[in-house]
Every structure is written in structure tokens, then in C-alpha cells.
Amino acid sequence: YRELRRWGFSDPSAVTVFGYGGAMLPETFSENDIDDLNQLPVIRTDSKILFYAQGPISWSYNEKTKEYDHEQNTYSTAGYYFLTDSKNQSATIVEREGGQTTGLQDITSFDEHAVYEQELYSPGSTGRLFLGDDFRYTTSKSFTFELPGVDNSSPVKLRTSFGAKILGGTATLVFTRNGQTLPSSNTDNIGAGSSSSYDFVRMTSTLKEIDLDSEELAFTLLFRQNGGSLSMARLNYFRFNYKRKLQLYNGSIQFRLGQLPANSCYNLQGYSTTTHIWDISDPLNPVSVKPNVNNGNARFVPTKGNEEYIAFDEQATVASVEFIEKVPNQNLHGLTTPDMVILTPKEYISYAQSIARLHNENDGMEVAVIDHETVFNEFSSGTPDATAYRRLMKMFFDRKGGLDGEPLYLLLFGKGLYDNRKIGETGKYVKYPTLLTYQHGSGTDERQSYTTDDYFGFLDDDSGNRIASDKLRVNIGRLPIKSEQEAKDVVSKLYNYIENNDKGSWKNQVLVVADDENYAIHMEQAEEICSIMENSDCLLYTSPSPRDTERSRM
């Protein structure tokens, strides 16, 4: 409560919590999508309020590998929530009984997961892949990880993802532990493929199962180059899947089982009168479980078998949160449906408003100029997410009547980066305000990874994950400005264009520019576009630089 008072809440006991944290929004629209902010149930003690919060890493069970996979939020390094004391009635948490546990097999360990990942470098300055530790110059590195409570009756599964780029050669990953080389497999090798000229990096994912006799996992990873010219060798991540004893650690534990044994129940050790067990399978609507307790052991039956649970002691020290800013009242959901939306960083609002006036006065358009951070507040719990832009446009599109409604326009007034989080070796030095970009593909192959603003215009129900076939329902443009001077210059050019009545060649001739890669398919596509334009009889082919015979595939 002391911290809440420092943030300006005079009565911390009246504070309520809204939001859904740091997990990336689903990219496919569905009827289960969250609209606006939801209130979370909390536990109130004499000194604090407790609620379940999600961070930027999401986990899911892989039925094929029998491991838990993780996904980093490609737009944010944190999860955000909103606090208010505006007389909201507290959300109540649903309770359920722990069920009949007599005669059932006790589950005393669970499937734990963890990840070591440093996102430092984008191999192709595109996509969502960021690699970590560099092995080019120091080819052998030792690692030590503490795994408190590991159940040594089962091996630790160590999943290693690694990337390298070697011209004319291959490489091998070699793992050693206690002076002994671990058994090798084909997935330890990184080789050149048939499309290596298009590769930014070639990745491998290899699995080692390691038996432990303590809570410490130590090993050495050697990157062994087998000929060729090396330009990149980086670790992506180590991911750990292992059995862990089911008990509280420093006052809390989050647990689950990928495969639940028949006729079984959880048996949590170290339970007390101040311990709570929540089913957080639906993190927005946690369910409190009332276990059967005997001598500090809490037994309860899972309802389905694949639920996610958290147990915590309300008196224990919990993770602290960071104050970000005070948020003024807003209501994008209450806006009159516009003809055009201009999304921009707040630094360029006045220039965007000039563009809005231009379209209003000359085209009769109703234009909404919106600070893009306010979109996150209502459509992604305050957490930056490109899908929040899309959800805003989906709301307006549906209100206009969908395909039967009037046209809708979107202008992105601000430059974007492939590094949305500004975490890489280039992005972290960018100081100008940016808008988010949608990055398609992992970023390993230049033919399969690209940036497209079309994503913000895929507004049909169930659209969003089929870039090649989803239909564009919004007219979209971007003015990639990165300074106030550029914003001023762009606005001036737009006004000059609209207000200049000279219908000379500068308004009536079009130059279409296309890449000559991929066997000139893009040039053919450009010609198809030209064929539907008027006055497109002349096509000018030019190369801005000397041709590279290896990369020019005509």
C-alpha cells in the first residue's frame, strides 16, 4: 500500500486492476477476442493487493515433441496493467472444490519450463528472429543454470536453437559435461541448403537429455566450423523442460502437466492457511481451488488435465511492479466512425491534424487523428502490439457495415522499424518516435520475410494469418517520417499537391519501380499493374547499381 500511496492513490484498499498483460494478441480474429479492458479479481491483505499478471513470454504444450514451447512478444518487453480508484466494484473470483481425492495417485512433481535467451541481433534486419551469444571469435562457452527443486528421477530436456551462416562450409555443435562429450545427433549439424544464397542464417534445433544428481546444470557448448567462410554464429536460446517437485518456492509456484496420469490428483507440499491455489488456464478469469488439506499437503483433482495453476502465499514477498505513467481518460470506442484514420506518435499530432483538415475541406472526409499509444490502452492492455491497430480498424469497419459500407482509409504517419522493441544492435540507438510494423516470417530467408502494412487492412472475421489470401478491406498508406521537419515538409507537399491546379505531367505520369529478384517475378507483377493504368505505354528498366551475376536471376 505504501507504493500505491506514492503513486497518488489515497485509499489503496479501493484500487482495482484492469488489463491482460504482455502476451501477444492473437493475429486471427475470432469471436473470443477481448474488446476493451477487463477487470481482474484481486486478493486484498492489510498491506497489499495481489493479482495474476502475464509477462511477455507465452508458453504452449507441443504434442509432437512433448515439450513446452515459448514465444517472445515481438512488440514489447513487458506486460502492462491499469490501476484505478474510481469506485469500481471489485471483481469476484469464482471458487471450486478440490474434488474427491481419496484413493487417487498423488502427483508430486510437474512439468517445469524455463528459457535462456538473449535477443541482440537480427540476421537479416527483417522478421521476428533475434539471436544472442556470438560464437564467431569465442567458439567454446560454458554455461551454468540453477534448477531449484528439480526432480532428478527424470532427465532434463535441453533444447538448443542455434544459427550460423557459412559460405561453402558446414558446422557442428558439440556439447560436453563433466569432461564427457554428450551423444551427438544429426540435428547438431548446420549445413548449406539449396537456397543458401537467399539465407540470412541457417538454423538448427537440437535436443539433449541430461541426467542430474544436483540442482545445477553445467555444460560447455562448442561451435566447430567445418570449412568455408563464416559470417555468423549465434545462439538463439536454451530451453529447459524438466520435472520439478510440487511445492512453494519463495512463496509461490506456477505448475501444470502436459499429460495427466489416469486416476490422479495434485499433491502440493507446504500449504498453509495463507496459501491460495488458482486455476489460471484462463488468466482473465482465474478460479480459486479449495483443496483437501492434511498436514500441509493440499490435494485436489484437475478438471480437464491440461490446466495451468499458480499457488502462492499471500504473506510472501511478491514480484514488484513499476509505475509507468498516469493515463488521462480516453474513449476510442466512443468515437464517431470516421472515413479516415490517421495513426501517429503524439509528437506529430499537430501535423497529422493538418492532413486531416486538408481531407476534410477538399474531400469532405471525417478524419480521426489518433495517438497510437491510446490504441494500445484500449485494444492491447497498454502493451504495444501491431494487432491493436488492426482491432481499431476492425471496429470501424464493422460499424460502417463491412463490405457493404463506405470505404475506409488508414494513414500511418510515422516511420517503422523491423525491430519494434528497439532491442537490437541498431534499434536500441533509434531515438525518434516510431509506429509499429508487422513483420512476416522468422527472418531467416529473404524470400519469406518482409514488412507489410497490408496486415492492418485484413478485417474479415477469421482473417489475419493468411497473408497471401486474406482480403485487404482498407485503403492503407504510410508516410515514414522520423522528425518534425520531415512531418512539416510532407504536410507542405500534400497541400501543394492538392491545391496546385496545374494538371501537367507531374500529376498525370506514373513511374512504377520493381525489384528484379526471384526470376523477375516482381517486374512481371509491376507490368500487370501498369497494364491497368492509363498512359502506361512506356516502361523504363534501369538498375541503380552494377549488376551482381550471382544475385540477378533474369
Provide a role label for each language-model segment.
Residues 546-548, 552-554:
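Positively charged, low-complexity/disordered segments
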Residues 1-543, 547:
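Cysteine-dependent hydrolase recognition
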